Each structure stands twice: as C-alpha cells, then as structure tokens.
Amino acid sequence: PEDILAFENKEVEVIPITEVMKKDSVVMYKGIRYRGYVYINPSKMKVIRTSYSEDGISVDNVYYDNVIHICVYEGRQMLYGKDITKKMFAGIFPTETLNQMILADMNFMGVNNKGYQYQATLCVPESSVYSLANITIGFDNQMSIKKAE
C-alpha cells in the first residue's frame, strides 16, 4: 500500500559520545592529603528507553551507558582503583528502573572514618528521573553501595 514508507521498519544509527570526562578533587583527612579521580568513559553498552507519542505509539530510544573509573591517591601512591558499571547497582534499584537508566555521573565526596566516599548518579536519559547511590570504599578496599537517603 501507499503508506508502507510511513511505517518502514528501519534501524536508527545512534552515534555514541566518545569523549572521556575527567574530574579530580583534593581533600584533607587527619592531616593527610587525598586526591580522588573520576573518569567517565562512554561504552558500547546500549540502554533502550521506551517512550510513547501523543498517539500512544511506542518509540524505543537507544542510549549508551558509561563505565566510570574511580581511584584514590595519597601523594603518588594509588590506594584504590576500580571500574564501576551499572550492573553493580542491581539489588539496590528495581531491575525495571535500572534497565532504563544510565550511569551518568560520579563525585568524590571525601574521606571519613569509614573510608573514601563517592556518590553516583543514575538517570533515565532525557527525563528528570534520577537516583543517587553512596559508595564507600573502606580502608580495607572493600566497597559497599547504598541508595542515598
């Protein structure tokens, strides 16, 4: 029929962001200077978000998730380094919600008596929906993740 072109099923090419974003922070704790680094690396892991038009037609939008590398230094000595992925937040957020989110940002919040503190932002692309998670890396290099209150 004549409307076949209007409903042609074509796969849309999504252009990934290839720029690595770097952040670093310096904090003092008990007279020791710590430097926390965050490297936000685009990946090829796809996140599909379904939205609906005014006519009720579903549209799948494809986004690319990030892998975030975090590390803590005291002077030139690296005390901790690890890649963080969205999969590490399973069990903290509902699976259905997590599947539509990307690991968007990470901030080094400081050092306290529990260890190195980071805060991750996971968000649903092109929406105001986001969740925060607090990451603690203990001085024994054990990591714990909790939903921010």
Regions found by a protein language model. Name each.
Residues I4-D105:
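Surface-exposed acidic loop/strand-edge motifs in secreted or periplasmic proteins
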Residues I68, Y116, A133:
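Residue-level detector of short, conserved catalytic/binding motifs and their immediate flanks
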Residues Y73-L79, F108-K114, T136-Q142:
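A short, structured loop/turn motif at beta-sheet edges
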Residues G81, V129-S131, K146:
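Short, solvent-exposed secondary-structure capping/transition elements
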Residues M88-S128:
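Acidic, glycine-rich flexible loop segments
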Residues L122-D140:
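Short, exposed beta-strand-loop hairpins at the edges of beta-sheets
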Residues N141-E149:
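A short, surface-exposed interaction/processing loop segment used at functional sites
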